[in-house]
Amino acid sequence: MQNELLDDPMDTGAPAAEAAAADEPLPPAHGIDREVTPKPAGNPDLMQQSLDNPAIPMHLIEKRDDRRESCDDGYSLTVNESAIDIESLACSYDSNAFFLRARFIARHCPILRADAYISLINYLKEHTTDITHYVAFFNELESELARKEFKNRQLNFQIPLRDQKWIEENGATWQSTTDQLQAEYKRHKDEGVKESTRRAMEDLFQHYMMAGKIDEAIRLYSRGIRDYCTQLKHSINMWINWMEVAICANDWGKLDTVTNTAYRSLKDADDAEKNSQQSQQAPPQRGENAPYMVERDPNAPIQTLTNRQLIETALAKCLAAQVLLKLRNKRYSQVVETILQIKTECLQSKWFVTSSDLGIYGMLSAMATMSRADLKLQVSGNGTFRKLLESEPQLIELLGSYTSSRFGRCFEIMRSVKPRLLLDPFISRNVDELFEKIRQKCVLQYLQPYSTIKMATMAEAVGMSSAELQLSLLELIEQKHVSLKIDQNEGIVRILDERDENAILKRVNVTCDRATQKAKSLLWKTTLAGANIHSISDKETRPKRKNQKESAKFDRNFGGIDVDEDPRGIAGPSGLSDDFNIAYDQQPQQQVQYLEDLGDI
């Protein structure tokens, strides 16, 4: 039987198929055997340019966008509004976060496509050595500028010139740098020094990321980077890199595994750090090592981040990555719960998601899943959400309109912010579903107090046309959220009461029987009290146990009144008539009279 390779659930490396090749030597920097002529997989113009210019390595042009290019494959979307300012986007995000968002806009917004490509070209040239995307984006920009529809359009950026010198220099140095880093990594690995091996792996990983080689970076980290992390800060850096590269590669399965394992490890480290700090913070004795105000030297070097700060930053990023994952899986209730756990002050300001993004994701998810009472309590009245939405006054107004039943204004704001949300790569696929859920909840909330309502009045109140309202009502009927009839001739909507009449009558009869029984019981008690009849339960007639004699004696004190025993040995309160304890020792004729009275009742 052939041995099967199984994945270790605690291992953050690649799947078993990739781990099996971990012992194989790294491929050479040139990547492709020159004797084999590969089939061009990228742009033919890029291939021809690489053949004409030997300074550009063939492997940099052959495979174009790696996994980042497939992040929105199969997603058909076109936004024909200029809903985002590309310049402000570059200020709000950096590195791979800006790359993903600008690339998504270039694919799905024809109006902003040229501006997005120009920003991407400038970013790649200034901050990376990614020749592949640089050349590809230039070709796409030239194709966009050559279109007839583009002639009357104005650009917000100056069109750059293709820097052939930069392409040749980076193409020539990339191969030698890769060979050098690979040789250094192999040498340290053979020597068995963990710290040196980890540094070599980190250098090679960053080199691949700078060149846009996501697959190579993942394959390198899958060779067991976790085994070489000897300090807490090394492990934290590893988790953050794993999460970022998984998001860039659009590998949501890997992101799920990494975030779950990272969260457990970081929480354990956080608990250990808290216990360590508490043990070290013992109060000093009076007069011994008492802290006084000390003037700080302005020339002294700034202290690096403590382990606690590193852990909190990593936890914030881990939870933010889980928000993206749960949003992708449409678990909207968990999105709200996770956002409330994030310490936004510890989250990097220009990461894949900002505090404002988290506020938008959480607010829309809450509106789509929570009742209005819970929404007011957990979102409107929550300081965390108010802080997240400080820079989004329009969305704050949307939330207020929804909770105050101003549905017309609510739908108006939703229509105005929809294009901007559609150009967000992390929530774009959820916008239509979230808005539909919110719209249905608004319609149901409006119908609740009515049994009959005019469609024209309702359409005006919710800010929809009669046709749109009718379609929305039909969807609610099909999903069995409401039972109603639409009279198109009179333009009236009638709400049907599906409650069973027999069940209602049965409940009424049960209630009446209970009330009658209670009234009879009161009359019986009144008659018994008028006849001076005292009812004794079985519990009171049971013989007392030996250990209860003393307690029983004290129970006969009647709240402090002295009890005297008569000659017959029967205890009775002094000064009270024996009629107080009369039971059924009266004359039989009187008993018959009492029973007849009770029978009449």
Curated annotation (Swiss-Prot):
Region described as Disordered: spans on this chain: 1-54, 268-294, 535-581
Pfam entry (one): PCI
SUPFAM superfamilies, per database record: Winged helix' DNA-binding domain
UniProt record, GO biological process: cell cycle switching; oogenesis; regulation of oogenesis
PCI domain span: 338-500
Bias (Acidic residues) ranges: 1-10
Signal sequence extent: none
Family membership: Belongs to the CSN1 family.
Subunit annotation: Component of the CSN complex, probably composed of csn-1, csn-2, csn-3, csn-4, csn-5, csn-6 and csn-7. Within the complex it probably interacts directly with csn-2, csn-4 and csn-5. May interact with itself. Interacts with rbx-1.
Function per UniProt: Essential component of the COP9 signalosome complex (CSN), a complex involved in various cellular and developmental processes. The CSN complex is an essential regulator of the ubiquitin (Ubl) conjugation pathway by mediating the deneddylation of the cullin subunits of the SCF-type E3 ligase complexes, leading to decrease the Ubl ligase activity of SCF. The CSN complex plays an essential role in embryogenesis and oogenesis and is required to regulate microtubule stability in the early embryo.
Protein name, UniProt field: COP9 signalosome complex subunit 1
Naturally occurring in which organism (per UniProt): Caenorhabditis elegans
